[in-house]
From Swiss-Prot:
InterPro entries: SAM-dependent_MTases_sf, UbiG_MeTrfase. Keywords: Methyltransferase, S-adenosyl-L-methionine, Transferase, Ubiquinone biosynthesis. Coiled coil: none annotated. Pfam families: Methyltransf_23 (PF13489). The gene is ubiG. Belongs to the methyltransferase superfamily. UbiG/COQ3 family. NCBIfam families: UbiG (TIGR01983). It is an enzyme of class 2 (transferase). This is Ubiquinone biosynthesis O-methyltransferase. PANTHER family: METHYLTRANSFERASE, UBIQUINONE BIOSYNTHESIS O-METHYLTRANSFERASE, MITOCHONDRIAL. It catalyses: a 3-demethylubiquinol + S-adenosyl-L-methionine = a ubiquinol + S-adenosyl-L-homocysteine + H(+); a 3-(all-trans-polyprenyl)benzene-1,2-diol + S-adenosyl-L-methionine = a 2-methoxy-6-(all-trans-polyprenyl)phenol + S-adenosyl-L-homocysteine + H(+). Its EC number is 2.1.1.222, 2.1.1.64. It comes from Bordetella avium (strain 197N). Pathway: Cofactor biosynthesis; ubiquinone biosynthesis.
Length: 241
């Protein structure tokens, strides 16, 4: 899918195949038993960790980069934040807006590249979240720099992505996509996974200081996700400007 917005921005940092992939699934964003079931399951954990480090979201201005259907955006808004969610998948944003109308949760959604928004609203957000997005774009460093530009001095930027090692290939691709079928086949590309050391270096180069990291684990027997110190597969990184 080439949207009007993406067609007018020929040099934006987007993988069209990735955009098409998520656009095709857009109608199922808010079905907790769909391909997005893992995101629904980990969302409370992500929100709790953000609040644990950054404090109350009440009255805070928050940007959710790569918001998709708005799962995290709505949760942060329900916690009292003034949330803007951005994504380039127009179909996902349409679903996010419709769900917001149904739930009564107010979130502003925009179809704009994070790099473009950084030139418009530099230093205007207390918190920026960029969850499960970096591994889906051609230039993750560009996204990190834009997130750093958008957050206020002293503000927080939270990332989550996948480590790159044999274990993450086995668990995140073979296990999650082919054996347990938690995700559609082809959701992830191993070469786009990012080591924590690489993300930390990118953050520092952008003026962000890594301030905490947690791993995300899944127990296939209990079907429960939890945060842990094991960052070998999925991990979250908190940084501060």
């Amino acid at each position: 899918m080439t949207t009007a917005n993406s067609a007018s921005r020929p040099n934006i940092n987007v993988d069209q195949a990735e955009l098409d992939k998520f656009s095709a699934l857009a109608a199922r964003w808010w079905d907790p038993e769909s391909e997005f079931k893992p995101l629904h399951a980990i969302n409370p954990l992500r929100l709790e960790w953000i609040q644990e480090l950054a404090g109350s979201l009440q009255g805070r201005r928050v940007l959710d980069v790569g918001c998709g259907g708005g799962i995290l955006s709505e949760a942060m808004a329900q916690a009292g934040a003034d949330v803007t969610g951005i994504d380039l998948a127009e179909k996902s944003l349409k679903i996010a807006r419709l769900h917001g109308l149904e739930s009564g949760v107010k979130v502003e959604y925009r179809a704009v590249p994070v790099e473009e928004l950084a030139t418009e609203q530099a230093g205007q957000y207390d918190i920026v979240t960029c969850m499960e997005m970096l591994e889906h774009v051609p230039d993750p460093n560009s996204v990190v720099r834009a997130c750093a530009a958008l957050v206020k001095p002293g503000g927080w930027v939270f990332f989550s992505t996948l480590n790159r090692n044999p274990k993450s290939f086995l668990f995140a691709i073979i296990g999650a996509e082919y054996v347990l079928r938690l995700l559609p086949r082809g959701t992830h590309s191993y070469e786009h996974f990012i080591k924590p050391s690489e993300l930390a270096a990118s953050a520092r180069q952008a003026g962000l200081e890594p301030s905490g990291m947690r791993g995300m684990e899944y127990n296939p027997i209990t079907q429960i996700y939890s945060l842990s110190g094991n960052t070998s597969v999925n991990y979250l990184m908190a940084t501060r400007k």
